[in-house]
Amino acid sequence: MAINESFIGELQHEAATTRKVLERIPAETFDWKPHEKSMSMHRLATHVADMFGWYAPTLEQDELDFANGYEEPKPANTEELVALLDKNVAAAIKCLQKTDDAAFMQNWTLRNGEQIYFTMPKAAVVRSFVMNHIVHHRGQLSVYLRLNDIPVPAIYGPSADEPEM
């Protein structure tokens, strides 16, 4: 199996689960956050949906420099949030489909100007900086749902709200 085929399968599975989480977020909870230092529900959900758009910059470029700036999308409602996810997932699949095994072994660097945070093979970046990062923040988002009495979907197993998978 080619590396891209493995990543596509995982991406599709995680995207479907993420979609279930995002679809449950009512716009009236967008400003809510559990602590003053925490991201708002809207900011965290947008970050999760937006990270599915990180495949192309990771696989088609050799670095990301925060010094160049980045403007995250600002979906106005739940439908736009889910549409952002769907758009990014479709683009990620297209990008993965055209990426060969050799490209996954090329190094990629995350930096902020002269400060280098890390350099690692693109396959490792996709796994850790993109996919594991998405899963981490989706987990936080599921706690946000619980704290707002919004039913939490089954993710890797049953939840208290969805005991059947």
Where are these regions (language model features)?
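Short, contiguous alpha-helical
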Residues: I8-R19, T29-E71, R111-M165
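Short, charged, low-complexity loops and linkers
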Residues: M1-G9
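His/Met- and acidic-residue-enriched segments that coordinate or traffic transition-metal cofactors
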Residues: R24-I25
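Acidic catalytic patch
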Residues: K98-G113
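Helix-adjacent hinge/juxtasegments
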Residues: P57, D62-D101
